[in-house]
């Protein structure tokens, strides 16, 4: 039983791996961990909207293993919010979520924009002088002045709080580089 959706499920991003586990998200908003030896799901969480990026994986000095990922609006129509998340890779528990600054709009049918809103590519896990940051490129964000562009957000890895942001002059669907 359940509802039939009017789109096909697919995996747009790539797979991250740690040990025997593979992590990936799909167009329906399900992020899951699969044991590559048994091909059985270890955990799965519903993020409420499409995942089009490859999750970024980081192992921390304390032994924790974490995924950083985000969603894109419009494919499922179940959510009106772009989500940026840190997830415990071993349990599937959400460590933090940042939504406050992002007001994205879905505009794929808009001939001028021709673009999804949200996280379209993997975030950058900061190293060296920026090892406390995770950096997301979020496409098609509506700013306070109602203009729409991509925005690069740097978040504190520990808390998910925004450290800085930089609006871009155009849409952008690429991973940030450091």
Predicted regions and their residues:
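Extracytoplasmic/lumenal domain signature
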Residues: 1-178
